Regions:
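Sec-dependent bacterial lipoprotein signal peptides
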Residues: 1-26
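Short, ordered, surface-exposed loop/turn motifs in non-cytosolic proteins
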Residues: 52-72
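Short acidic/polar inter-strand loop motif in beta-rich domains
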Residues: 115-122
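Beta-strand-rich domain onsets/edges
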Residues: 26-45, 49-55
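Short Pro-Gly-centered beta-turn/loop motif in secreted/extracellular proteins
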Residues: 89-107
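Extracellular beta-sheet/turn segments enriched in Thr/Pro/Gly and aliphatic residues
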Residues: 28-36, 125-163
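Short, acidic Ser/Thr/Gly-rich low-complexity loop/linker segments typical of extracellular
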Residues: 71-94
Length: 163
């Protein structure tokens, strides 16, 4: 009798668990969208103009976009070199999260480095453009739930000559 009871009990439990398993595969709140896992993403490019203190454009300056974590260090996101007009533009870069969050948290910086040893009209001291002097503008809407769109970072700088 005990064996027969366990047999029926196991059959009933297996049936109920199967039904519960299938019901959990249904749509969530009436939607037929899959659950999303991971991080939201966005893309950005940085641009700007670099001049000497007298307003002369500087060619060959390396502009490095960084996310500054304070004592934990910096994460170099992208870099570009200035042209003869002093302009630089980085390539479109994808990232987890959104660049405007980094900007609002005052962690976004652009480091300007003279890397050509005086070939651009003198040697210039390294300079940092901080978040307060950087603008971030959304230039494209994202598609879907996790794509937050594309952004344009603008950072212009004036560099001082080394003494």
């Amino acid at each position: 009798m005990k064996v027969k009871f366990l047999h029926w009990y196991n059959a009933l439990a297996a049936t109920l668990l199967s039904l519960l398993g299938f019901s959990s595969c249904g749509s969530e709140f009436g939607k037929d969208e899959p659950c999303l896992y991971g991080s939201p993403t966005s893309s950005f490019h940085a641009k700007g103009n670099v001049t000497a203190e007298d307003g002369t454009p500087i060619k060959g300056i390396k502009a490095v976009v960084v996310e500054d974590y304070g004592n934990a260090g910096c994460y170099r996101m992208d870099s570009a070199y200035t042209d003869s007009k002093g302009d630089y533009v980085t390539k479109e870069k994808s990232m987890d999260g959104a660049i405007d969050w980094v900007h609002k948290e005052k962690r976004l910086k652009v480091i300007l480095e003279d890397v050509d040893d005086g070939a651009n009209g003198g040697e210039f001291a390294t300079d940092t453009i901080k978040s307060e002097n950087i603008t971030v503008e959304q230039v494209g809407k994202g598609e879907g739930t996790w794509d937050w769109g594309s952004f344009e970072v603008t950072a212009n700088g004036k560099m001082k000559k080394k003494k």
